[in-house]
Structures are given as structure tokens and as C-alpha cells.
Amino acid sequence: MELTTTQIFVELILSLIPATLAFNLGKELTK
């Protein structure tokens, strides 16, 4: 299966969302 640029971009965003949420949560907890 060939990945298009759009699919790669979507996968990248979806993988970054949980990391961003965890990072922000960690910042809130360590205030």
C-alpha cells in the first residue's frame, strides 16, 4: 500500500496529539 503525503501528514498529526496533551498535562502538574 502506497502512502500519500496527506496520509503521512494525518498520521503524524494524530501521533503528535497525545504527546502534546501529555506534555501540557505534565507542565500543569509541575507548576
From Swiss-Prot:
**GO cellular-component terms in the record?**
chloroplast thylakoid membrane; photosystem I
Key words, A-Z: Chloroplast, Membrane, Photosynthesis, Photosystem I, Plastid, Thylakoid, Transmembrane, Transmembrane helix
Checking SUPFAM superfamilies in the record gives: Subunit XII of photosystem I reaction centre, PsaM
Q: Where in the cell is it found?
A: Plastid, Chloroplast thylakoid membrane
Give the chief site where it resides.
plastid
What topology in the membrane does the UniProt record assign?
A: Single-pass membrane protein
The regions listed as transmembrane in this protein's record are 7-26
Matches recorded under InterPro entries: PSI_PsaM, PSI_PsaM_sf
Q: Name the domain of life this protein comes from.
A: Eukaryota
Mind listing the GO biological process terms from this record? Answer: photosynthesis
HAMAP family reported for this sequence: PSI_PsaM
Q: What family does this belong to?
A: Belongs to the PsaM family.
Supply the NCBIfam families for this chain. PS_I_psaM
- What is the recorded name of this protein? Photosystem I reaction center subunit XII
Gene source species: Phacus acuminatus
